[in-house]
Amino acid sequence: MINVAEIMKRGAENKKLPPWVNMRHAWMVNDGLRDKDLEYPENVVRIKNLDYKKKLDAERFAAILDSWKMDKQREMLYASSGDASDIDSDSYVSNSLFDLCVPASYMGASDKAYPVIVSVHGGGWFYGDKELYSYYCCHLAQSGFVVVNFNYRLAPQNKYPSAIEDVAYLVKYIDDYARVFGLDMNRFFMLGDSAGAQLTAQYCIAASNQGYRKKLDYFT
């Protein structure tokens, strides 16, 4: 188990930057070493860079599925925008992009209704994005799930409850478009790592409480 002090030594600390930026540097280096030379499963496709705060272009999404039948690429772009913000910048702000990691069988199926897993990434509430958990989510998808891997707003630029709001927005979004995405929301699962585990637990508790559901408009 690598502790925080050991992880910090892996980053190139810059005294001119805030401590949280240096910590982000260190975690990025550590995660890069963790994922070095990992290979993605050959029977899984990533549909990248959908946005859960924008209306889904269902025709564009359908066109992606159709185009896959021609060239069988393992990575399909819904939008070409970048995944991570500039980690050196004080204005580091996460976006609302998400990926679908799907079994290859999903791409050619009609009238599909796949079980779905929402994966909430870790990072101490101030670091990380969907790319850090892409390999992990693709391996989950091998078992026949559609796995949703997404970004959420991070501290310190975004104050509580920004992150948990984004978890709720994401779940509502995939529920709203479940038919388009071919999801069976009766077989819905969530998981999270570290900060993601806390956000997952908080979401599930709040979403199952009628008092919270009446006060907040973003729970499904």
Feature locations, PLM:
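Primarily recognizes the serine-hydrolase "nucleophile elbow" in alpha/beta-hydrolase
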Residues: 169-220
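Structural recognition of the beta-strand scaffold that forms the well-ordered cores
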Residues: 116-119, 147-150, 189-191
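Short beta-strand element of the alpha/beta-hydrolase
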Residues: 111-124
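N-terminal cap/lid segment of alpha/beta-hydrolase-fold proteins
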Residues: 22-112
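Alpha/beta hydrolase fold serine-hydrolase catalytic domain that processes acyl esters and thioesters
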Residues: 3-16, 36-37, 55-57, 73-74, ...
